[in-house]
């Protein structure tokens, strides 16, 4: 039987040493599902609430004992006895139990931990891997990875405002080959940084955080590292940026302190267009502030036909906000972060809405991660065709990549690696 007989949460630590919620769900059959929740550094204003204790005497106020208590009491009482296969029903019970738009009572970290653990338990009970349990028996694609090799912004203590500089191995024939390509470029970049006297310490997501004079210098380093590893930038490898523009948008201007310049939204769109013209950039995330819809419209009109424009802080994995963006014709891709919305069911709804409107989806980690690899299975289950889960270092990032290797091995000949077809909204 797949009825839930026990739900138990605990406080564990994430990759930054901050508390987060882990949950175990036990079924009548004796199987157990376990899941842990990630946490972001640069967060969208409209994200579901991550409930923290606020007690400055514990973990500087970042404890999650209240969220744990909500799981072990209200949520457990509401869900024990329900069939774990009823994922949508279970998630809806938690949504109604919380009673707010942003999971403000129970905390999205509480509801998501339970939601993911229920899915894992149900998959185990059915004898299926999680990606098959959630994705069904149809054909599946492994995702093209966005590998964060240079960190800036909120993810590093350096001079760069743009938060992530990523490589995408589009010339690979398999995920295994793509991972090898990324790792070889990562190590070539480390040697290059070392030779130029830059520190080779890594940021929150495993990328290097050199103190550079400009964003162009970071992109040029990536070109050099790609070539040093034996690959061609623009053919084997394309670049992606996460601007996280909301972090440097103040008083109606985009302030690039590293370059000593401030831009209006029209000027910043031109700045980004200049980078696209000079470097092989295929994807730009959060190119405008989350509330600058005018700027997003300008950017989409300027670059949306040839570059993937990803809404993260803009859409916060929320189907209602995504629907508004689709109606207004802004961006052309959705970044998918399960903890932005707080349940698996709502996450899957957002991905489905994006697909139906020819918006690409990019499954994503957070900067504060755990060893939980659920998003790897989700990327395959939803046929997202793209995943963003950090650099080629730190076990919290590699856990996702290694799970994708296992999935590709299990799927064997049925595993497709989409390469440039991952950018289907651009007609690639």
Swiss-Prot record:
Its EC number is 4.2.1.11. One of its GO terms (molecular function) is protease binding. GO terms for biological process: glycolytic process. GO terms for cellular component: cell surface; external side of cell outer membrane; extracellular region; phosphopyruvate hydratase complex. It is found in: Cytoplasm; Secreted; Cell surface. InterPro entries: Enolase (IPR000941), Enolase-like_C_sf (IPR036849), Enolase-like_N (IPR029017), Enolase_C (IPR020810), Enolase_CS (IPR020809), Enolase_N (IPR020811). (2R)-2-phosphoglycerate binds at residues 163, 337, 366-367, 388. Its cofactor is Mg(2+). The active site is at 205 (proton donor), 337 (proton acceptor). SMART domains: Enolase_C (SM01192), Enolase_N (SM01193). Catalyzes the reversible conversion of 2-phosphoglycerate (2-PG) into phosphoenolpyruvate (PEP). It is essential for the degradation of carbohydrates via glycolysis. This is Enolase.
